Amino acid sequence: MKNLYSANQKGLIIYKTKHKQTGRRHDYKIYKENRPDTPKDVESIVDLGFLGVEKDYPEQISSLPIKKKKGNQDLTIEEKEYNRIHSKKRIVIEHAICRLKKYRIISEVFRNKLRKYDMVSDIVSGLVNYRIMNSI
């Protein structure tokens, strides 16, 4: 199963896509099919799996890391610093996904009926959000 998650800067999961049964899918393709309606003033901090989001959705504020150029050219100091700042913002969503995967029903093979997967992942997302809200 593959879902995409969005989280705010506190780590609360604010959006989750429905699962796809068709096997391997690229993150950006799932994003284009299930794009959340984010306000125009909200920045989307994404990883390199979403190359093309700035071109396809110019009205949306999005932040991608800078990709290393072809050949043996290293990034400049400014580009490395930008990527470091981007990673500090991005780690919040990675930690949210990690919290989800602590529940074995999400991280391992789903052994129930597939039609129940979205409900189960919604429940786990709610539990993760509940724990975060009670620890703040």
Write out the residue ranges for each language-model feature.
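Short, well-ordered secondary-structure "scaffold" segments embedded in the functional core
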Residues: M1-I136
